[in-house]
Amino acid sequence: MARSLVCLGVIILLSAFSGPGVRGGPMPKLADRKLCADQECSHPISMAVALQDYMAPDCRFLTIHRGQVVYVFSKLKGRGRLFWGGSVQGDYYGDLAARLGYFPSSIVREDQTLKPGKVDVKTDKWDFYCQ
């Protein structure tokens, strides 16, 4: 009986950590459109500084610490307008590219505009895909 309860507890714990955010795959879209500096959203729109810490709720988002520099590559429109897409400066290892993700626009202060973010781009499933 005790062994069954332990096994049940382990199964419950494992299932709590194996949700879609951990496993990978498509996640719900935050928005249907976004503003970028170019059609591919490959150039940063601006540089911003984090005003507070932000813990990513799932793999679509970035964990950001107060004072970190954030490169903003996109600004979601419509229902997702409160979120921007970008990467954190120094968030890379060796030859690996920095990870892109979303964060609330309210936690950063834009300090420098690099390129106007006026190109309206349709989002696709890859914009919200977890690896």
Curated annotation (Swiss-Prot):
Subcellular location, principal: secreted
Keyword Disulfide bond (UniProt): yes
Molecular functions (GO terms): growth factor activity
Keyword Disulfide bond: yes
GO BP field: extracellular matrix organization
PTM info: May possess two intramolecular disulfide bonds.
Signal peptide region: 1-24
Disulfide bonds: C36-C41, C59-C130
Entry coiled-coil feature ranges: none
Domain SH3: 43-113
Pfam families: SH3_2 (PF07653)
Protein origin, superkingdom: Eukaryota
Cellular localisation: Secreted
Tissue-level expression: All malignant melanoma cell lines tested and infrequently in glioma cell lines.
Keywords: Disulfide bond, Growth factor, Secreted, SH3 domain, Signal
GO cellular component entries: extracellular space
UniProt cross-references to PANTHER family, sorted A to Z: MELANOMA-DERIVED GROWTH REGULATORY PROTEIN
Summary of subunit composition and partner proteins: Interacts with FASLG. Interacts with TMIGD2.
Functional summary from the UniProt entry: Elicits growth inhibition on melanoma cells in vitro as well as some other neuroectodermal tumors, including gliomas.
Membership in a protein family: Belongs to the MIA/OTOR family.
Name used for this protein in its record: Melanoma-derived growth regulatory protein
Organism: Homo sapiens
Gene from which the chain derives: MIA
